[in-house]
Each structure stands twice: as structure tokens, then as C-alpha cells.
């Protein structure tokens, strides 16, 4: 009897110790950039020593590619970003660094998530679409601010021609909405202050401690206030001669040269996607391209990624290979060059400066449409509309029985 009681107690103690050492569940984290901390949620899953971590981009999860917790030592890899979390787990706290050698390592800390009751405050309603006048290096004159709101809670994204900031999430406090975003690749803090004149004052702090201030007006009032329209992503980039077939000839990861004149593309509808594994908006877009390829490849759709990587990735494309594996990419992937070579490697394009950019080729090999950037799910209805328009475009091109030599 004493033996059985002792065995039960020992089992309970072992179980309690295992639970105390378990990371499983939601955690409240911060990552430090320069002199400010960005709060975020992270979720850990654990099976034995194996650990998986997931950051959040709105409702989307950004999961790790591998990880382990051995004794107090926690190591989690996000190979598709070429980043890692290295930390100790002790006394209920995860503490260490996150980052990589190229962009640096940043102090990281997390504690078990504590659900905070919704603030008993009446927040002003700012839901909807806003226009931000801004002159960008890409030639834009305005951006969009897309806001989704539930009471005092906000999820917002700034949508540029190349894509969005990711979901900036937070609550109304002290007369302003205090928001943050961290998905392992993008780090941002934002404050949105509603003004008496109906406008919004925005402070956005991002990578390398950059602080930018903007004013936003309701999109339906922008024209009357003299605020320009945001750039149309369908008009941002064009080709010099739309009557000429779109040409490419680059090596794939095995070293084999693949060209637009290959039999593989003859008489096919082709999506040519300018991309890079360093580009967060390209990560946003990849699952949609995979979905399109899976659905329409048998009907005559080919997708070709023209990938531009930094010199070190071109020598050792481990991040790119992890990117391809992460998203289950089976369409053609070509190493086109370095980001600085974009225009030289695709000389037919005019004003090609957005990552990603997607060219839609008809069965005759000619460019039928070009879309700059990718509005991700954080952009709400703009993401829904983009997916719908792209799908309809592909179906229309596939329905055209044009067969011409390239």
C-alpha cells in the first residue's frame, strides 16, 4: 500500500514537473528594436523535446520550421526567413534573442499569456478605408489605410503599391489606438489618433528605429480635400511593347536553363512572378500562387518565379530552398539575379520596382496584364477582391484557344 501511494505521488510529481517545463500555449512576447519594444503574441506547441512556434499576422499563423527545448535551452528556427530564436526557459519566462547575422539579433522575452479584460472605454469608430497622402520612392502619391474594428480593438494595415504592412493590432487607450505587428519578418509600432476634424494622425515606427508621421482622411472624402488617389497596382508597371512576347531565360536551382521558348510553355497561359525570399509581401503571396497552380495547372496554367536574391543567398540558397519547401511550391523556380539587377534582367518592363510583381501572359506569350504587389489578408476586402479578379483573369485567359509559337 505504501509502495502504491509512493508511486502515485512520484507520478504526480513527474507530471507536474513536465507541465511546469511545457511551453505549450499562448505567450505574451516582446522583441526589442533599438530603444523600443514591440509586443506580440506567440504560440508554442511541444511534443517531447520538439517545439514549434507560431507568430501571428492577424488571423494567420507564421509557423517555425523546427525547434527544440532541451533542459533550459530553447532553439527555434524560421528557415524560410533565415532567422532563429535562441533563448532559455526558466521560472516561467522565455528570454533570449531573435534574428539573424545579416540584420542583427534582438532581445526577446515572453511570458504565459494573460487575457486582459476589454477596456471599458468608448472608442471612436474609425473602421473603413482611409487615404494617406505620401510621396514614395516608387512614385506613389498616396497609400491606403484599411481598418477593421470591434469596439476598442483594432486591426489595421497600410496598403502600398507593393503590399501591406501586415496586421497592426491593438486597442484604444489614452485617446489613441496603440498598435503593433511582429510576424518574424516585419516589426512595427503604430499610434493612430483620431482628430477633431475627422482625420487621423498616424505615427509608424519600424525597422532601424525609423519614425514616420502621416495624416489620413476618409477615402470617400479624399478627392474633395485635394488628396490624390493611391496608385492603381494594375497600372504601375507596363511593358515597352505589348505586341512582343515576354522573354526570360534563367537557370533553375539545379543549374538547368529554362526559357520562355521551351515546349513547356508553348500555348500555355503563364504567370511570371517577380519575387524574392527576403520579401515579406512575397511570403504573403506564395500560398495564393500555390493554390492557383494546384487548381489550374492541368487546364494549361504554368507559373514561373523569377527570383532575385542577395549575393550570399545566390551562393548558398538555404533560405530560398526553405521558402520553396515551406509553401509547397511545385511550379518553375528560376534564379534571375540580385535585387539591384531587376530592371537589367527584365528589360521589357517599365517602372518595375515592386516586390512582388506579376505578369499574366496569354497563350501567345504576350503580356495581357501586370499587377504590382500583393494585398494580403490583413488588407481585408482588397485581398478578397484581388484573389477574385486574379482567378477570373486566369479563367478568361485559359478559355482563349489561341496557340502561337513563342
Indicate where each model-derived feature is located.
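Thiol-/selenol-based redox modules, centered on thioredoxin-like
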Residues: 354-406
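Structural microenvironment flanking redox-active thiols in thiol-disulfide oxidoreductases
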Residues: 284-327, 339-346
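Short pre-active-site segment immediately N-terminal to redox-active cysteine/selenocysteine motifs
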Residues: 268-270, 275-278, 285, 310, ...
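A short beta-strand-turn-helix
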Residues: 248-270, 293-296
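Central antiparallel beta-sheet cores of small beta-barrel/beta-sandwich binding domains
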Residues: 21-90, 98, 116-196
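Short, internal strand/loop/helix patches
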Residues: 249-251, 321-359, 363
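N-proximal helix/coil linker or "cap" segments that precede and/or mark the start of modular domains
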Residues: 206-251, 263-267
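Bacterial N-terminal signal peptides
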Residues: 6-15
